[in-house]
């Protein structure tokens, strides 16, 4: 498919455009409030990252939300970067990932055209509600992005492999 600017659009370019739009739009408030955290949740996340403890007891593995820390702890411990700076970078990256998920869901599950899916991703990225949720709740943003990428796998539930893959992705 050709765009009005003469660029041929593919799914990989659509994902890249959606990720870039989400990243840039979510990065603006982080840059404006640079040395300070935007949300009070960021202080909570930074505390756990600095403490280095995800689970106080092994049983909290099943009752706590640890997936965000699973991605951020190794980066924080190996690079030694400040936890607030890492969270200021992780927020826009996670929002870009979620915007990509909206595009992928519209393209794969709903069967929309490339232009319509790009519009859905662009519309999601400028909504104030989605921007607000992504600034406060990084764990929810990660979970929503993973859900949007996992839902198109439901179409492949006719095979055992597809069922197992979608259940693993959703759990």
Task: List each language-model region with its residue ranges.
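Structural signal for the C-terminal ends of transmembrane alpha-helices
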Residues: 12, 109, 150-159
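A compositional/structural signature marking long, glycine- and acidic/polar-rich segments
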Residues: 145-149, 154, 166
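Active-site lumenal/periplasmic loops and adjacent helix-entry segments of GT-C-fold
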Residues: 15, 19, 25-145
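Membrane-interface alpha helices of multi-pass inner-membrane proteins
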Residues: 161-171
């Amino acid at each position: 498919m050709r765009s009005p600017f003469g660029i041929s659009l593919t799914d990989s370019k659509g994902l890249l455009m959606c990720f870039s739009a989400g990243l840039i739009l979510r990065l603006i408030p982080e840059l404006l409030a640079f040395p300070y955290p935007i949300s009070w949740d960021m202080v909570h996340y930074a505390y756990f990252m600095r403490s280095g403890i995800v689970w106080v007891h092994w049983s909290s593995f099943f009752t706590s939300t640890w997936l965000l820390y699973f991605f951020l702890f190794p980066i924080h411990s190996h690079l030694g970067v400040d936890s607030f700076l890492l969270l200021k970078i992780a927020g826009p990256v996670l929002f870009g990932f979620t915007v990509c998920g909206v595009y992928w869901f519209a393209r794969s599950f709903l069967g929309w055209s490339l232009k319509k899916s790009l519009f859905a991703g662009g519309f999601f990225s400028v909504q104030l509600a989605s921007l607000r949720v992504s600034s406060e709740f990084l764990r929810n943003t990660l979970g929503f992005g993973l859900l949007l990428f996992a839902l198109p796998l439901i179409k492949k539930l006719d095979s055992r492999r597809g069922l197992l893959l979608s259940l693993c992705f959703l759990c």
